[in-house]
Amino acid sequence: MAVQNTHRSYIGIAKETTKGTAVATPTAYIPVIANTVKPQDIYTPLFDEGLRGSLVKNYNYIQGRIHSTFDFGGAVFADTILYPLAGVLGEDVVSGSAPYVHTLALKNSATAAADAQPAAYTILDFYGANVRTWTGHQFHDFSLKWNADGLLEYDAKSTGWQSATASTPTPSFTTVLPTAVWTGTVSVAGSTISNSTTGNIDMKRPVTPIYGISNVQTPYSVFVGALEVTGKATFLMENDTQLTNYLTNTQPALVFNWTQGTGATQTQIQATMTKGAYTLAVIERSKDFVEVIVDFNAQGNLTDAGVAGYSPIKWVVKNAVTTSVA
């Protein structure tokens, strides 16, 4: 046996047709940063604590129900970022051609007995010593983060069924370049500004592995709840504009947009929050220059909505991916 090198690792992903049924061959391979990749099978511990006349707490350990989690992240690539975005939101409508426009919003339904849950995904993990697939994974956390002089980065979290060993695939990675933050623009209340320096957008949904009694350890369903979108943005404080937006509850439209290239190979990642409620604004003097750090909470609205209902955020992603991944 040989000690395995971390840098041999890679992960792949594919949308499942049937939740919990593994897709043998990934449709995309996602470049990730090594220390962000954290797959884990989690058993509920069951302990026999029956008294037996001794100063012992536990006598037997039984593995209870099982689910798994898979965290990963890294630099944002305008094609593979679709998977966690669509996984959290549930709706990906494709239009145009070369580059294709993916409009991602919160999946809703007004139809009785409809399934409003997002799609589930199979995640493949090659970790040198072996290969495993993690099935039925629902994305529930996504964080986009940026600093003016760095790369656009993200973290994603998913929950699903237990892992299983798999065959080694032949990976094929994106040729798209990661996104440099300096290529972006920031718009507040319809006006483009140039004094925003750092920020993040966090999309979170509660997730619950639901267990039935059917002689299996795996969940009956991995269920995600309502979406909340929050974030922070730092501005150089040249005037009171952003502070006033907070004090007067203006709730300005916030648009963060990154576009690279032209023509058929152009890529774009744009987040729009039409009702960006400022929940806090702090004047910051830890540097040689004054900043104001704003916390925001995106409110549900019809402008950012998809096919049905409300949505607090809408993403537009342009790339060469021809089909929906939701």
Show which residues each predicted segment covers.
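Signature of extracytoplasmic/envelope-associated structural regions
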Residues: 1-326
